[in-house]
Amino acid sequence: MSTPEPTGGPVTDEERRAAGMATRREVLGDAHVDRAVAGSTPFTADFQDFITRTAWGDLWQRPGLARRDRSLLTLAITVALRHWDEFALHVRAAKNNGLTDEEIGEVLQHCAIYAGVPAANHAFAVARPILEELRAASPS
């Protein structure tokens, strides 16, 4: 097995942590990240660091997919796995990454066939008030 080509991304844990925290804040928003960090305990601190370094400092840094595409995938996966808190969080992230309400709706329609109508139905119920809130808060 050959060694993958370097991506030019972060290499050390500290670089991954810094890049991950920056990306996490850009995608999820400062308010969410501040709550997650403030809510960290000695029991959860290592897990929060793991998420920041691996999910945000490694996976979301890879050049193969744009953040917008990663958001599409994340929405679909969280619906399929019925992880509703993560789904709600990533509806907001998807908007931050440039997805429209219509595109989010299309993801959920697609999920109805591949992940089940009950999951997609619940996803619409979770997404609707979030999208309404974001529309109301957006300067038009």
Language model features with spans:
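Mid-chain, well-packed structural core segment of small domains
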Residues: L75, V79-G105
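Alpha-helix N-cap/helix-initiation sites
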Residues: R62-R70, W84, D101, G105, ...
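Short alpha-helical scaffolding segments that buttress acidic/His motifs in well-ordered protein cores
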Residues: I51-A55, L72-V79, V107-Y114, A123
